[in-house]
A protein has these predicted regions:
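C-terminal and inter-domain tail/linker signature
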Residues: 1-133
């Protein structure tokens, strides 16, 4: 039996491998994606669009990952190690700046074993300071 911890671990392994296809295979068609800045995204298509945008603008690896799971819910704490590759609309100009900041996420897994919610938090002001805003 695959556990919530196994599913979330596989999701973040796919993230670190840059394998968006594997990430998408682990999320439900009706996934809800919340980030601490901006509006929630509903559905796999918008989640895929967000990931394509992020891959274009940023290269990130998550380290020091700790995953806590209970039932169908999980939390993850990690360090985001990134490079700002292409200017993201409304943000400072990108020129290869690197950043390192703590982040966290809350996830839930449905009865089919697919992630149906990803809520991610990080400190945007810390990121802006690190990229020279």
């Amino acid at each position: 039996m695959t556990t919530t911890r196994d599913i979330v671990t596989a999701y973040y392994a796919a993230f670190n491998a840059g394998d968006t296809g594997a990430m998408l295979a682990l999320v439900a068609d009706d996934v809800r994606h919340d980030v601490n800045q901006g509006e929630p995204r509903h559905g796999k298509a918008l989640f895929a669009e967000f990931n394509a945008h992020m891959t274009h603008c940023y290269r990130e690896q998550l380290t020091d990952m700790v995953i806590f799971a209970e039932g169908q819910r999980a939390a993850a704490e990690f360090i985001v190690n990134g490079t700002y590759l292409a200017t993201d609309e409304g943000l400072p100009e990108a020129n290869g700046q690197t950043y390192r900041l703590p982040g966290g996420a809350f996830l839930s897994v449905n009865d089919a074993g697919l992630i149906d919610r990803v809520t991610t938090y990080y400190n945007l002001q810390d990121w802006l300071r690190q990229v020279g805003a």
